[in-house]
């Protein structure tokens, strides 16, 4: 029986039998500041939407899409990054955030941050028109 399940950038929706498998729950790393940018490819969408900041969120998984209570968030300034550069940065700070969350859970010393549904945004895979708009805004993948 595991103590904790850790999902990193998971794109599966877990059901209760998996979520409840571990004594201390299941956590996931999402590369955006939840509750905004739930769903897929947040690095694309924060760049396309000209956000000044993004970050990572480590949260307890529930049966929703990136909707569980947040344990740790880390913020990063975007500047003029390419998507590839942003992914590299958020993966690095994401690993630090996962380690911090595991430590807090192990010590049972954390205050959950509400993942407020009323403030959520959700994104899926970009359409051709989204990619065109991305390029028109001077954004780059590489």
Positions of the model-derived regions?
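Donor/substrate-binding cores of folate-linked one-carbon enzymes
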Residues: 4-129, 133
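SAM-dependent methyltransferases
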Residues: 139-142
């Amino acid at each position: 029986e595991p103590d904790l399940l850790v999902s990193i950038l998971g794109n599966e929706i877990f059901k209760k039998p998996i979520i409840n498998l571990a004594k201390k729950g299941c956590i996931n790393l999402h590369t955006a500041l939840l509750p905004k940018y739930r769903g897929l490819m947040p690095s694309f969408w924060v760049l396309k939407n000209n956000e000044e900041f993004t970050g990572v969120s480590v949260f307890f998984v529930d049966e929703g899409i990136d909707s569980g209570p947040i344990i740790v968030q880390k913020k990063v300034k975007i500047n003029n990054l390419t998507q590839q550069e942003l992914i590299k940065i958020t993966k690095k700070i994401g690993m630090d955030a996962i380690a911090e969350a595991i430590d807090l859970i192990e010590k049972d010393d954390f205050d959950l941050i509400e993942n407020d549904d009323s403030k959520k945004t959700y994104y899926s895979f970009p359409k051709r028109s989204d990619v065109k708009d991305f390029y028109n805004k001077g954004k780059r993948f590489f």
